[in-house]
A protein has these predicted regions:
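Acidic, low-complexity, intrinsically disordered interaction modules
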Residues: 33-90
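Short, low-complexity interaction segments enriched in Ser/Thr/Pro/Gly
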Residues: 5, 60, 95-99
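Acidic, proline/glycine-rich low-complexity IDRs
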Residues: 79-109
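Generic marker of "main functional regions" within proteins
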Residues: 17, 21, 68, 79-82, ...
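Negatively charged, low-complexity tracts enriched in Asp/Glu with abundant Ser/Thr
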Residues: 4-38
Length: 109
């Protein structure tokens, strides 16, 4: 996989109830061997009774070269010690995102 689009499509095609990105990568290790995901920020969260789903933005690197950014909709918190990700039937979903940099100014007195 050499582009954000390829990675996004692979995740969305194969994201069958692993629940979180880490489990998904473990399940598909060979495909993600050269890919690194670095946490950037959490965009939103949806709190459920037994778990929390968040949309998390990651920088995506291949061989230390930035490919771009992906937002991953995934389970970020299990509230019950007796639950596992496979109990939830939550698919990992990926979205392309772009970084927006805001610039502001402050008066110096």
């Amino acid at each position: 996989m050499n582009s954000i689009k390829e990675i996004k499509e692979f995740i969305n095609t194969n994201g069958n109830s692993e629940g979180c990105l880490e489990n998904f990568i473990d399940e598909h290790y060979e495909e993600f061997e050269e890919i690194d995901f670095n946490y950037v920020e959490t965009l939103e969260t949806d709190e459920r009774r037994w778990y929390i789903i968040s949309t998390v933005v990651y920088e995506v690197y291949k061989n230390n070269m930035l490919l771009g950014y992906l937002a991953i909709n995934e389970v970020t918190t299990l509230k019950s010690e007796s639950s596992s990700y496979s109990d939830l039937f939550v698919d990992v979903e990926a979205y392309e995102v772009k970084k927006i940099v805001k610039e502001s100014f402050e008066i110096i007195k």
